[in-house]
């Protein structure tokens, strides 16, 4: 919870901008409202008229009303308020119940600035009582001393005189006879003339009373007197007097010779000689008593000429009415500020301080607090603009002082937040939400949330200040099952809004904070009566609906449970074993659940043979204060067993037992003192006789904390500050805070509150105590966010909670290894390892460690280590050596620690052939893949992905081919324009083709470094079932309108006759120039049959370039961009040549320029060619076939 702040500091700038209040007319007018005359104490006789003065002065109009004993006094014919404000009572009535006029009167003066209340005036009627003490007859020897006294109560104090034989004694007599104002008559050196009857007369201005008579008898003395020590027969008595009264301290002594009486002060101060005198033979009279006269006076009777003396002492207490030593000062404060009035008074006895607002008493509650002599008003509102009075009163009178609070309002202040509503979240938290002010909401810089208990008086109001970016707040640290009142205030730089509407919300119930305190007694050897008191409301936290009793024999482990309704407070266990120790405990439950169980309380059942044993007493325990417990008991009057006494035992919970304390049979009360505050004590009591101990009674009780009334009025100390939290482990957090510099107290204790964020059950909140400014909080959940707060305790006072600090515990170290570890060889020397995070949703991984090594390195303990971040679940293992088997294992870790390694995974790297040791490693072909398929860890998901990808790629290629074919039909008409006739004979082309046989060898060498992934297809199967009429050269596709045609590559038009009726292909030549594609059929020739046709040469001369780009050392041609780069060894470059190698049995050939036969379609007749057009058939090189298959369209 945010700390309580003082929002009154927010608009402090406003005070600097305000004009001097003295320049504002009428602002200080309230100072004119004061009393010129106030009512004074008065004593009158019944039926006498009464005048009580009250004259107020100030800005008119001024209205004066009267209060009697704090209530408004109604006017009638007998009681009237005069025009000057005085009260007139025509005939005083007394001692007739409500008709009595006796009491305390005050006048209240009101004008437009406020109201002030006068001091109290006590009106009493003159009365006199009967004599409380009458003179007593006495007999003294001649020459001795005689003393008579009487006592009477009256209002006003009566004047007492004496009569001798019904004749008044003069007020001033010789030194032998002294009449004291207190009602004492002293006679020294009594003689026969003093014998007679004496009585006292008490008189006031309205009454007179006479006491009974007392006789003085003088006995003749012996002729000779013996010496005897001085004796004080009437010592001074303690006296309490008011200021300006007269005090008499009597001191009368006898002895022989006659003692000398002297006075002194016990504090060795000198006695005031101006107001003090000795009356008679040693009585001290102090007139016009003042405070400095108070003290202890010592009367000393000394035998003359000796050191023999005797003393007597008495204390003089002087009472004084209250008087101010510090007066409250008028204040001017802005809206929502804080006002503090200070008022100090002194008097004897100490005056009681109270505060008035416009004449009405203020009660400390919510935002208005009274601490001893201070009045603090928080969150000032316009209604706080008033006149405040500090009243100090004691038995001697009352006095008041006034001050004005002026509230300055800002015209541009925001309106109040509205639509405030509260929602209960848990037993200790309530969600408060509101809407922004409708007016000037854009200028709001902060909100303050105020809350306090809705029931009771003197409730503390708490305040939390929030930023302007939120309109809701969760108030926690509330008491369960309690009503709270909330309101909101909005702040801006120049002031604050009015308070929002108040809302009240109740927290949920919670489990009881502590169990009931039980009492155990036995009525027979086989039963135990269990009784308990209801849990106090502050610990109950709801309505108790169930009690659960658990009991067992101390020698057994089985527990028996009895559940009782919440309205039951005792239960009798019957059928128990005699002379056995039973353990009993109790648990209380609300509607939420069961609370904490009490500790096991032991009780021994009586012996079965204890027929004459005394019954158990009825025990009652009551804490008198924080260190004392009153133990009371009653014995059964019907118990026939004799009782010799009682034995009392007690112990603090968890400590060793004290006792027995032996008590007499007449003792029914004992006080245990010297206990510790806030401790639970177990007390047991039993009666005993000469035979044995009786049945015992057991009961537990808790001592309260030592908090006095004076302490309750002291403001609470500030909370600890700079609270700091740091996670230590996954189950502990270290806290550190600073002690506030508010006191020099040496003993300070702290309470730490700890709970997970969002906790719904307040009973799960952890409270820890320490006297240090740091603590390691243990037993927390891993990877959980907690909130912490600290409060301090000093001199039985507790501070508010410090601001809440949030911190998260560290996660646990991974308890399991990564799962699903897979290793895939993706290159000859590179493998891909993948895995999944360890099982468990709470596992947090920040790093993975990959260890891998060959078998030899593994045996030597030499691992290669890789690290990956926690979000990465794959890694590449590079620079693997062929022919080795590698061991791979992975572990997960975080900032707390390292997890375990799983079982190792092995990877075999494909060995190389000796013939290929100096070449690049080859990829596995299909047959090799079967042999080493065991080393490929491809799961079903991987295979499915590959198949889907290949299918998509083939579909795209097919769509592209269809699009090209469709678009080529529109461009057939342009083919004739792009084809040029050639004049060179076919022999030149044949020669060029023949020259390509040498280059075919180079091509074969080039293809040795290429991968072979699919079986080769001869070029004659390129279009086995016919094709389209598409002709492509370097200028683009050539489209012919002839729907029936045959494709030829480089046809010899000089010697081959085209016969359309037979549709026979006379010659087909396969040729590919990198970067150039030319497809020609015999029907597509632009020349007539027999005409020589010349094709353009896109690159270089007419001779075919059969050099493979991968193995070419150079070119005799002026190379161009049609060739692939000679520097790239990773690409596959293809060329089409016509081979002159003799055919083999495994080779498939197409017709060429020198072949004897050409392949025929089904149904075409054979047609021999001229000899000059044939040549030895050449097998197609594998590389050439591959290239032919790989030519893009």
Swiss-Prot record:
Q: What is the membrane topology here? A: Single-pass membrane protein
Tell me which GO cellular component terms the UniProt record holds.
plasma membrane
One of the protein's GO biological processes: cell-cell adhesion
Task: Provide the alphabetized UniProt keywords.
Answer: Developmental protein, Disulfide bond, Glycoprotein, Immunoglobulin domain, Membrane, Repeat, Signal, Transmembrane, Transmembrane helix
**One function term, GO molecular function aspect:** signaling receptor activity
Annotated spans, Disordered: 974-1018, 1078-1193
Q: Known Gene3D superfamilies for this protein?
A: Immunoglobulins
Q: Main localisation, per the record?
A: membrane
Q: Where is the signal peptide?
A: 1-23
Would the keyword Zinc be found if you checked this record's keyword annotation?
no
Residue positions the entry lists as glycosylated: 84, 238, 625
* Compartments it resides in: Membrane
Topological domain (Cytoplasmic) residues are 966-1193
Where are its TM segments located? 945-965
Q: What is this protein called?
A: Protogenin
The organism of origin for this protein: Rattus norvegicus
The lineage, from the top, is: Eukaryota, Metazoa, Chordata, Craniata, Vertebrata
